[in-house]
Amino acid sequence: MNSYIYALGFFDGVHLGHQALLDAVKKLALPGARGVVTFLNHPDTLVLGQTPGLINTPQDRELLLKHYGMDKIVALPFDKKTQTTPWRDFLEDLLEHHGAAGFVCGEDFRFGARGAGNARLLAEFCREKGLPFAIVPEQTLGGSRISSTRIRKLLDDGDMEQAVACMGHPYILTGTVVHGHQLGRTLGIPTANLAFPKGLATPRFGVYGCTTCIDGKTYLAVTNLGTRPTVDGHHITVEPWILDYSGDLYGQTVTLEFRTFLRPERKFESLTELKTAIQANAQQLREQGKDFSGFLGARP
């Protein structure tokens, strides 16, 4: 069994605070021995009886963790067994079954039954076992702690720029392009259509400036996230108009990188008025996006 230094946490958003943990792992472990232990479902589902809307799908979270250099991702179910496992047994299990050879956590990290495990006890455990470890202080931006909760609020407010600043990377959303009403094509604005994943925190409805990588090339995308009130106004959809791209994306997986909030979603009096607004958004994005480069690059 290979050995790994593991960062511990849920890592929703993989924000700058999480990246500080990943950086600590990279200082302790050589490439090939860097890992993360996280959970398939949010602990609050059992601990508090409620599930917060998440920033990332599990697939996008894994994509980000790998982007930041993690070689192994252990995603455990947070179930009754996990919830009632004593903190020491939890660490021992990682040593025995997952090749753990050291740990990294944040200074406020709690784990084990009743949250009895903490950073101090983890440090004592590692000293006792002769294992390397690191306890990472919280990260702040603008004098306030960076947290997934803070980022969810920023997304809800439509403050994409500040959310991106807290994450240290764009807000990403991956989906498979499906057939839509093809209204955009009749307007000369062909859009791809993606379903908004269930269980995610919903950013403010509106039009966003995004980047996306297709066949190794980065494109700008004017993206409507909302219910399309001018057309039908029911289901949440994600519709990027990928500028200067003319290929067929049906059935393909696309990762959108949200960079900036262009305007709130609104109902227009006519499709002509809608088209004019979208074209204005495209010009706005071309100006703002001159310095944007693709974040993730080609999807593996």
What kind of feature is each model-predicted range?
Residues 2-58:
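N-terminal catalytic cores of NTP/NDP-binding nucleotidyl/phosphoryl-transfer enzymes
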Residues 15, 65, 103, 163, ...:
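Residue-level signal for inorganic ion chemistry
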Residues 20, 60, 162-169, 273-280, ...:
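A non-catalytic, amphipathic alpha-helix used as a structural packing/dimerization or gating element
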Residues 36, 75, 135-136:
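A structural preference for short, hydrophobic beta-strand core positions in alpha/beta folds
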Residues 43-129:
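N-terminal Rossmann-like or analogous alpha/beta NTP/dinucleotide-binding catalytic cores
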Residues 126-226:
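Glycine-rich, Lys/Arg-enriched anion-binding loops that position phosphate/diphosphate groups
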Residues 180-300:
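Phosphate/ribose-recognition catalytic cores of enzymes acting on nucleotide-derived substrates
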